[in-house]
Amino acid sequence: MMGDKDITQVNVFFQNWKGAIAIFNKFTSSHSRFVIELKQPNSGEFIGVSFSFCNYIAGSTWWENCDLKCFPWKSPDGKSGYEVRDDRAGFLIRGTDSVVIGDGDSSTVSQAHPLKNLSA
């Protein structure tokens, strides 16, 4: 579950990557885990962002000039979670566990770290 501090930190991260290229990287069904790659168009730096226990994904698989934002969300069965969207691109993802920034080898930047249960 992500708390208010988690949502705030994810949004700070997304603000730093505003304008990046967003690319579908992978989906792992065992944990309903979806990974996108954010890539800086001029420097070539990129980082993976993993969304765990997703129950809704909609939108493009590749878009430029991303502007992702994270919001609190409740699942139909009442679990607290997150909603990440880019309204201009028509991208939306909802999940009930965590957002992890810096997915293993999917990073070239030093800011890669998990954002999970920071407010617990």
Tell where the protein language model's regions lie, with residue ranges:
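Surface-exposed, interaction-prone regions used to assemble/regulate multi-protein complexes
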Residues: M1-A120
